[in-house]
């Protein structure tokens, strides 16, 4: 049972949300009085409460979603709040649906989407994983951060072939190494105000680090927003090569580190927007003609469930007609289907761009 001080804070937070008429978050939409009363006294076995789930969304009323999971059990215990939010965000993943088992599919179906190198600047595929037996950021102790980092770094140091590389802990990092990682766009910073308010940045930089292979085409972030972010990327449009590298890395890491998985929701992550496959496959792509015809761009993107962002990610402009385009769907489909849909959409966009020239 949550203690009285927590419940008092929750009551205040709920009042604040109710009064915020211009707040458009999914938290506000689905945290009704009856759901609130049903959940406010509950506590996971690791001690997380509804306050851990909603505090970022209460503090940041401009949140799009507004909830985070403090540990794996939270998705089950606080399901009356999480389930409708998940259904709303992952369009069509109903509360009765079950995410399919992991299936990377036939990796040879993926190709170089731009063999002439005229449109695609770079290609990236990432996924998120949580280590079984550990809560998510807000509930981790300093000792757990250190223990997780040593498990991750020793696992990664066993990687061979093109995945072989170096682990750089953020703790005690020299200015030179730091600058080198910033120049390569590899270094992650301490979390933004949304993550700060969710208590995702405690004991920073303890337990955080970055691994990359010698070619700088494979990267792992340890204890950034998720326990693990596994990233494969390179210049040009060879999605096949990027995907195959990611799949072999995930399979290697999984042999040594068990991942948190949920029967209904797939792989578990700190933020409910990343659940399921957790896979985001993206390209930086130059589409000058389509950039001038945004309506057509959005129409094709909609047809293939693609998300179109500015060059530097969410809430940014497309610099010089360069877009960041990725798959939107993460739940209710396999890893293979998610990336295949993105490949089909990108091929279609390139075809239309060529026709418009």
Curated annotation (Swiss-Prot):
Which cysteine pairs are covalently linked by disulfides here?
Answer: 201-271
Extract the ranges annotated as region (IgE-binding and beta-hexosaminidase release from rat basophilic leukemia (RBL) cells).
Answer: 113-127, 127-155, 204-218
For region IgE-binding, but no beta-hexosaminidase release from rat basophilic leukemia (RBL) cells, the annotated ranges are: 211-225, 316-330
> InterPro entries from the entry?
ATP-guanido_PTrfase, ATP-guanido_PTrfase_AS, ATP-guanido_PTrfase_cat, ATP-guanido_PTrfase_N, ATP-guanido_PTrfase_N_sf, Gln_synth/guanido_kin_cat_dom
Could you say which tissues express the protein in this record?
A: Muscle (at protein level).
Instruction: Report whether rRNA processing shows up as a keyword of the record.
Output: no
- What EC number(s) are associated with this protein in UniProt? 2.7.3.3
What the entry lists under CDD domains is as follows:
arginine_kinase_like
Top-rank taxon, per record: Eukaryota
List residues of the Phosphagen kinase N-terminal domain: 9-91
**What GO cellular component term, any one, is given?**
extracellular space
| Gene3D superfamilies noted in UniProt | ATP:guanido phosphotransferase, N-terminal domain, Glutamine synthetase/guanido kinase, catalytic domain
- Where in the numbering of this chain does the Phosphagen kinase C-terminal domain appear? 119-356
The similarity comment for this entry is:
Belongs to the ATP:guanido phosphotransferase family.
Q: What is this protein called?
A: Arginine kinase Scy p 2.0101
The top of its lineage is: Eukaryota, Metazoa, Ecdysozoa, Arthropoda, Crustacea
């Amino acid at each position: 049972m949550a203690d009285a001080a927590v419940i008092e804070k929750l009551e205040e937070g709920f009042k604040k949300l109710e009064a915020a008429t211009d707040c458009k978050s999914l938290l506000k939409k689905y945290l009704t009085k009856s759901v609130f009363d049903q959940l406010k006294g509950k506590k996971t076995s690791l001690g997380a409460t509804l306050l851990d789930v909603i505090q970022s969304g209460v503090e940041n009323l401009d949140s799009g979603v507004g909830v985070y999971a403090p540990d794996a059990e939270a998705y089950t215990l606080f399901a009356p709040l999480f389930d409708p939010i998940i259904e709303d965000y992952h369009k069509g993943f109903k509360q009765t649906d079950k995410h399919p088992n992991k299936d990377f599919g036939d990796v040879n179906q993926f190709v170089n989407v731009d063999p002439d190198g005229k449109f695609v600047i770079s290609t990236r595929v990432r996924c998120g994983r949580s280590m079984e037996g550990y809560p998510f950021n807000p509930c981790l102790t300093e000792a757990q951060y250190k223990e997780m980092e040593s498990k991750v770094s020793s696992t990664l140091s066993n990687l061979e072939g093109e995945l072989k590389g170096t682990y750089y802990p953020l703790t005690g990092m020299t200015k030179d190494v730091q600058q080198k990682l910033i120049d390569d766009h590899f270094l992650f910073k301490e979390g933004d105000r949304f993550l700060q308010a969710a208590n995702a940045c405690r004991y920073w930089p303890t337990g955080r680090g970055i691994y990359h292979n010698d070619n700088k085409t494979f990267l792992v972030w340890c204890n950034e927003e998720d326990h693990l972010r596994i990233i494969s990327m390179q210049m040009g449009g060879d999605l096949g090569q990027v995907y195959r590298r990611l799949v072999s890395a995930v399979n290697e890491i999984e042999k040594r580190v068990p991942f948190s998985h949920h029967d209904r929701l797939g792989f578990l992550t700190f933020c409910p927007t990343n659940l399921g496959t957790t896979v985001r496959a993206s390209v930086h792509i130059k589409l000058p003609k389509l950039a001038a015809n945004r309506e057509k761009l959005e129409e094709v993107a909609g047809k293939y469930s693609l998300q179109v962002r500015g060059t530097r990610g969410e809430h940014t402009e497309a610099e010089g007609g360069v877009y960041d385009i990725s798959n939107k769907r993460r739940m209710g489909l396999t890893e293979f289907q998610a990336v295949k849909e993105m490949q089909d959409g990108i091929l279609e966009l390139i075809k239309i761009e060529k026709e418009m020239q």
